[in-house]
Amino acid sequence: MKTFEGRVAVITGAGSGFGREFALKAAKLKMKVVLADVQENSLYFIREDLEDQGVEVLAVQCDVSKKEQIQALADAAMARFGAVHLVFNNAGVCSSGLIWEHSHEDWEWVVGVNMWGVIHGVRIFTNLMFECAKIDPTFKGHIVNTASMAGFLTTPLSSVYDTTKHAIVALTECLYQDLRLVDAPINCSVICPYFVPTGISQSVRNRPANLPQGELTASQKAAQFMIERAIVSSKVSARDIANLTFDAIANDQFYIYSHPGALGLVKDRMDDILKQQNPGDPYKTAPHIRTMLVNKMAEKANK
């Protein structure tokens, strides 16, 4: 997609983090913007910001884990703007801790948002884009799915999150292959950020009442501490990611990385797989982090 002005972008998780920055960047490029978020107040604020800039904007409160709400989002976008050219399946949440300490509700919440949210978005908006292409022979579409470096790596205390992000990488690669197979006027990309301040570490604020969080275990408290520590130390911002992403869209680039240096860890993992070695120590280059994590778990267990 080389032209953005006048095109329509749909963004889930638009109220904060990457989603908010995607919306601001789309506005800067003179796109029409459809905002979706489960959190009503944050959705209101980004809508106000864009309207103050004179942007044509539609805001829809949406729980992406519900297919009927994604369908309603697509219907609202078409009713308002008549087409959708760019979709960011971006909404995401996080839950961390030892795998056996996660409840069924933890899994259902994170898988619902991170995985089913993207599945619904891909299925519904890809079909919608094909319909748009039937009407406009010059139509070009692009779908961007937010995964993570956790889509390539596995680390302690990250089972639920890593599982969903691995799924998104695979789903998006399959989408790419299917689109190429039929020579579709649609392209796609997958964003694989490392630690970037987005607010996802506080995503429990949007956890639905029917999937309550239990009392946190020592491992879950320690994981939360370590995630927040890593995010605070990041030198890459959500705005940086938005700029990288729009450049990638313009250049039909599939993989989008915030921290290319982390690809060395991916190579190490692939080497283990190819050599049939047991999974390696993700902290081998930074053993102090493992020590800190173990100590923090012990500290939380004693409180």
For each predicted feature, which ranges?
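Active-site helix of classical SDR
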Residues: 122, 164
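Conserved glycine-rich Rossmann-like NAD(P)H-binding loop of the short-chain dehydrogenase/reductase
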Residues: 29-45
